[in-house]
From Swiss-Prot:
SUPFAM superfamilies: Adenine nucleotide alpha hydrolases-like. Pathway: Cofactor biosynthesis; NAD(+) biosynthesis; NAD(+) from deamido-NAD(+) (ammonia route): step 1/1. It comes from Chlorobaculum tepidum (strain ATCC 49652 / DSM 12025 / NBRC 103806 / TLS) (Chlorobium tepidum). The gene is nadE. It catalyses: deamido-NAD(+) + NH4(+) + ATP = AMP + diphosphate + NAD(+) + H(+). This is NH(3)-dependent NAD(+) synthetase.
Length: 277
């Protein structure tokens, strides 16, 4: 597959996502948002879009470092705060995470990373309740398809404007929006431990997997057609298995249908009951 198939008109993407954020937030009766600002490119893009949609006064960024978080991540988050002039709060999660694992000293890195992500979710949703705002999500399409994230952690949000953009496309949108170069140029990382990087964890690059996912999803190509494009068979099978295995992460909890109107199945339009004022 030719790489340009992943390219978008990013001016058009901005023109769609800015009113999307504004409309989705306001239709539920809210006017402001809170999001985790990690110093990475995904949260930077979402923060930029949110300010353009809602105004600087209606966006609150939380920085939630753990003791092993890199100083560079904090510096890059502050770079976005200074660029946009938004309000921010620093809420370290070290004490919460360490207290949880005080009686679980043999916990794996994966378990620790999940608890870090869910501790940050707690902070975001507590601020959401405190301030009467909605949590804005920062998970991209690549992460969602691969299940590369923590359910009820970094994947938790009320509205996710970038969930249909592959990581490769996030980079393109970031350049269009004028996100500072240091955030774009550094290797993507969840910063869960020192030296951690997304692509090292996954075992392949975002460019490689995005092109494969594009063939599988957008082009709906079958295995034989994909392998004919030169994709390695083992790579194809691994990615396909990740997509299938992590379907549950992309869904709300499945409800057994017993009545004529079931939440999430037949009953989906509560906003039709809202009074028009």
């Amino acid at each position: 597959m030719k790489p340009q198939n992943l390219h978008f008109d990013y001016g058009l993407v901005e023109a769609i996502l800015v009113p999307f954020i504004r409309n989705e937030i306001r239709k539920f009766g809210f006017g402001s948002v809170v999001l985790g600002l990690s110093g990475g490119i995904d949260s930077a893009v979402v923060c930029e879009l949110a300010v353009r949609a809602l105004g600087v006064e209606n966006v609150l960024a939380l920085m939630m470092p753990y003791k092993t978080s890199s100083q560079e991540s904090l510096d890059h988050a502050e770079l976005m705060v200074d660029r946009l002039g938004i309000r921010y709060e620093i809420m370290p999660v070290t004490e919460v995470v360490d207290a949880f694992f005080a009686t679980r000293p043999d916990a794996s890195r994966l378990r620790r990373g999940n608890v870090m992500a869910r501790s940050r979710m707690l902070c975001l949703y507590d601020v959401s309740a405190r301030d009467g705002c909605l949590v804005l999500g920062t998970s991209n399409k690549t992460e969602l398809m691969l299940g590369y994230g923590t359910m009820f952690g970094d994947m938790a949000s009320a509205v996710n404007p970038i969930g249909d953009l592959y990581k490769t496309q996030i980079f393109g949108l970031a350049r269009h929006l004028g996100i500072p170069a240091p955030l774009i140029d550094k290797p993507p990382s969840a910063d869960l431990w020192e030296g951690q990087s997304d692509e090292a964890d996954l075992g392949f690059s975002y460019e490689e997997v995005d092109q494969l996912l594009y063939m599988m999803l957008e082009e709906r190509m079958d295995r034989d057609a994909i392998l004919a494009e030169g994709i390695d068979s083992a790579f194809y099978q691994r990615v396909r298995s990740m997509v299938v295995r992590n379907q549950y992460k992309r869904m709300m909890p499945v409800i057994a249908k017993l009545s004529s109107r079931t939440p999430g199945i037949d009953f989906r339009y509560a906003r039709d009951w809202q009074e028009v004022r």
